[in-house]
Structure formats: C-alpha cells, structure tokens
From Swiss-Prot:
GO terms for biological process: intra-Golgi vesicle-mediated transport. It is found in: Cytoplasm; Nucleus. Keywords: Cytoplasm, Nucleus. One of its GO terms (cellular component) is nucleus. It comes from Schizosaccharomyces pombe (strain 972 / ATCC 24843). It comes from the Eukaryota. InterPro entries: Trs65. This is Uncharacterized protein C14F5.02. The keyword Nucleus applies. Residues 146-171 are annotated as: Disordered.
C-alpha cells in the first residue's frame, strides 16, 4: 500500500467508508483506478480526506482547520487543447469539511485522521467532459464555515478562486515533514443512510488513470491543494436503426455493445418510450430478465415495432438500458452496482408521399417531363437477392441507386404486394406477370383464389433526396410463403416530382426460388 502521508490520490468504490469497513482501506486504495464511479442528476458521492496525526489530541482538534473540497466539470472542445484554462468550467459541488475526524486509521505505528463528507453532484449536459476535484487544506478566512453542499451551479470562469490552483506553505507544521498529508476517497453512496437510489445517468461515468496536478507555490496564501482529473464517458454504445414497413409502421432496431473502456457489461433490461406513438417489443420476446453478458466484441439487438398515428409526422424516441459493468480486479470479475443509461432523445420522421414540389435545374424554368425521363434513364441502378429461400422465412432484396446528375432526385420504389409461381400463372393466366395483376389476388377461372408465394412487407419505399454524385442503399423485405419459382422484376422506380413519365424497372432479372 502506498503511504497516505506521501501521496494524494482518489479512491472510487461502490460502498461508503464506515467504521466496520475501515480496515479495508487498502482495498479502497488498490481499486482506485479500476472501479468506475457512475453519477448523474442529484447524485451523491462520499468523499473522505486524510492527514497524519502528529502529537495531537483528536478530541480537541482545532475547529479552524479542515478541508475545502470543490468539484468542477470541464468540457473538452478541441482534442489538442491541453490547458485547463481553455475549458468551460461548471461547478459540480463545493463543501467544507472540518471538526473532529470521522475515523482514525493506524498503519505502521502511524495514525491518520479521516474526514467523511457527502457531496451532491449537480445536473449537467456536457456530452464530452472531465470531472476535476480540488482539495484545499485549511479553511481560508474568506470562505464560509459550512459543511453543506453548494447546489447552485455557476460558471467557473466567474470565480477567480477556482481558476487559481493554490499551493502549500513549506513552514506549515503538518506539511513540512511530509510531501502530501491527506487523501481523497470517493465512494458511491446509494445506501439507506444517504437516501440515494441508483442513478439514471445523463450519459457519463468517471473512470481510469487521472492527472495529478503539479504543486504550485503561492506565498500570499497559506494553503495547500491537490487536483485530480477523471475522464468521463458512457460505458455503453447504443446505435439505433429505423426501417419503415409502410407509412404508419416502422421497425426500430437498437444495437447495444460495451464501450471500448469496458471489458464486460451485463444487460438487465431495455425499454423504449415515445411521446406520441405506440411502441411494442418485437424481439426478444421476454425482455423482463435479459441477463445478457457482452464482452468488448459482442453486440446485442433489440427490435421494437413503432406505430405512428396518421396525424403525426415526427416523434421522439428515448431508450433506457439497465446495465451492470464488470471489470477484472486481481483476476476476479468484479461487478459494479446496476445503473440505467438514458440515451439522448432521437427524432424519428415518418416517410410520407407529400413531396410534390417541382425540382428546378436553374432559374430559367422547371424541369421538363423529358428531363425527368432522362434523369431516370441516367440513374445507375443495381439489385441483388438470394437465389434460394426456404418457405416460411423472410428475405430482402438490396437495391443500390446512384445519382450521376448535377441535381438531387427524389424517388419512389413500388413493390407488388403479391408474387405468384411462374409455372402456375403462365399456364392459367398469361397476363399474370403484368404490372396490373402482380399486386392483386389472382383467381382461377372457376373463382378459386390462387395463393401468393411471396408477400411484400411494404408496397412503397420513399428514398428521400439522393444528392448529386451520391448513392443510397435500400433493403426491400419479403416473406417467402409457398415453394415455387418467382419473378420480382415488376418492382419499379418513379420520380415523385414528375409522375408523367414511365416508371423504370429496378431490375429485369430478379428470380427467386422458394424451397
């Protein structure tokens, strides 16, 4: 164990330092850079300061001596910025700690006084930030003598005392014999005595090796300070994908994986909420007790079905992922307390055929029908699909559209709802493969309905704007219903701004065999 009287450091744990576990101080020290401290809105941390006891009576400890503790959040605007003064600073907490010590620690015939303080982190919204904690020895005359938490966050730039990293006086009797004479222990305090529940974090946690500031001497101030900076980030990577089945229904796919800073995460639950739509879980079927463990290379997918009302164009989606982070400590996998990662709201827009404006090439006039036909002919299109598909399964046709023109183009892909077996329909209905019949239920001459073999999950797909010299990929989803041979060449593409032209085929050869 490193000597408490020679080095200042932070300890991060998930239990408060109490009388019954004071003997485990070595464990707190050993885990200082291996266990993360998660925090968020109205979240409490337990801070313990330490200094050696030298020929003093603890019961008559001077009341005018103690510690001032300040936590500051810093946003990193530019990666190359190294000076802390270039960061916008926001006060996270500020408190004083003085009076009789909370605990006494004895090691190698030396005694150390420990002061336990409770600090509350204010809410914040920095996406990329650091947590910087300063501990000042001695209460300055112009500071309030209070141990209450200052919960009113303010811009750190307006407080000169925070931007000045004060130092210690070599003549001070408690400092002259040792290089550093106090420590800061930070612990997650969510037990009953602190009345704090596991936090819903706004996207951050403290972790890893930290920067210990160099000591700076200022003869005008009889204080000593040590500073340490922790990186803050999200331990969970969450990616969202949306696929529109039709104008009212969309699949929302959530892909969850551990952050690069984590070795393992365990997903305990996942919930998605919207403000004006109906969302239901599609897969997996039993989300209540997932208990999915992911390593750094693993991903887990959750799919929701989103139903958007007809009068709503945009909705907000918010996801909550309940997670436990597990790290290796001395060859043992140590789990943290469960916490909930709250993903920032995502705006989802429905696809709608309301784009009826006229695209203009220049101020000279509108795009003519001939130009529109030419633009479709110049459009580079490719499509691919599996040759064999088992019945009862779903499959997709991948379409790639490249716009070589000097202006954007908005397209609509039309897909027949039903496709029929070529052999059967060629015998009985010579026109069954026409565009007029491909999306309708066909019947035998005696009135019996012919069962379709392939059913499309959506009959329309709007591409949105494909910008000049850009390409887009789209997946068209189908259900293989009945064995047979099927032709999907009736899939067509239209320019939504100019409906006078003849649609273009997606591909002339899209043959699917359902086994």
């Amino acid at each position: 164990m490193r000597n408490l009287n020679t080095e200042l450091d932070f300890f991060v744990s998930f239990s408060a330092l109490k009388e019954e576990n004071i003997s485990q101080l070595k464990v707190y020290w050993a885990q200082s850079n291996l266990v993360e401290l998660y925090y968020g809105e109205s979240f409490y941390i337990n801070i313990v300061c330490s200094r050696p006891i030298v020929d003093e009576n603890v019961t008559t400890w001077p009341e005018n001596e103690g510690f001032r503790i300040e936590g500051t959040l810093l946003e990193s605007l530019v990666e190359s910025v190294t000076s802390a003064s270039n960061y916008p600073k926001v006060n996270a907490f500020s408190l004083m700690c003085s009076g009789i010590p909370s605990f006494i620690w004895v090691e190698d015939d030396k005694q150390y006084a420990l002061w336990a303080c409770l600090a509350q982190l204010d809410s914040y919204s920095y996406p990329n930030h650091k947590l910087e904690i300063h501990v000042y020895k001695h209460i300055l005359p112009d500071l309030p003598q209070s141990s209450e938490v200052d919960r009113n966050s303010e811009t750190e730039g307006t407080r000169e005392e925070n931007s000045n990293t004060s130092d210690w006086d070599e003549q001070n009797e408690y400092v002259s014999e040792v290089e550093g004479d106090y420590n800061l222990l930070g612990s997650l305090s969510n037990d009953i005595q602190f009345r704090s529940n596991p936090p819903v974090i706004s996207g951050a946690y403290v972790f890893g090796e930290s920067d210990v500031a160099n000591e700076l001497k200022d003869p005008s101030r009889k204080t000593k300070t040590r500073k340490k900076v922790f990186e803050c980030s999200v331990p969970v990577v969450l990616k969202l994908r949306s696929y529109a089945l039709n104008e009212s229904n969309q699949y929302i796919t959530s892909i969850v994986s551990p952050d690069s800073s984590c070795e393992n995460i365990r997903i305990l639950g996942f919930k998605a909420e919207t403000n004006a739509a109906t969302i239901s879980l599609f897969a997996p079927k039993t989300p209540e007790k997932l208990q999915i463990t992911l390593s750094s290379s693993d991903v887990f997918t959750i799919i929701h079905l989103l139903q958007i009302p007809d009068n709503i164009k945009h909705i907000e989606l918010q996801c909550f992922c309940k997670v436990i982070v597990a790290q290796k400590l001395s060859e043992t996998l140590v789990e943290s307390m469960p916490f909930t990662y709250k993903h920032p709201p995502v705006l989802i827009t429905r696809r709608t055929p309301t784009k009826t404006h006229t695209k203009q090439l220049s101020s000279s006039g509108n795009v003519s029908a001939a130009q529109s036909i030419s633009s479709l002919n110049l459009l580079e299109i490719s499509a691919s699909s599996p040759s064999y598909v088992p019945s009862g399964s779903s499959f997709s046709v991948r379409a790639n559209l490249y716009n070589p023109l000097d202006f954007s183009i908005d397209l609509l892909i039309r897909i027949p709802l039903y496709c029929y077996d070529d052999c059967l329909t060629n015998k009985e209905h010579s026109t069954s493969k026409s565009e007029e019949k491909s999306s309708e239920l066909l019947k035998y001459p005696n009135g019996h309905t012919i069962s379709p073999g392939i059913i499309a999950l959506s009959t329309k797909l709007y591409t949105g704007s494909i910008f000049p010299k850009c390409e887009k990929d789209f997946d068209l989803h189908f259900l293989a219903y009945k064995p047979g041979s099927y032709d999907l060449s009736s899939i067509s593409i239209e320019d939504v701004n100019h409906v006078v032209h003849k649609p273009r085929k997606l591909s002339k050869e899209l043959q699917i065999i359902v086994t």
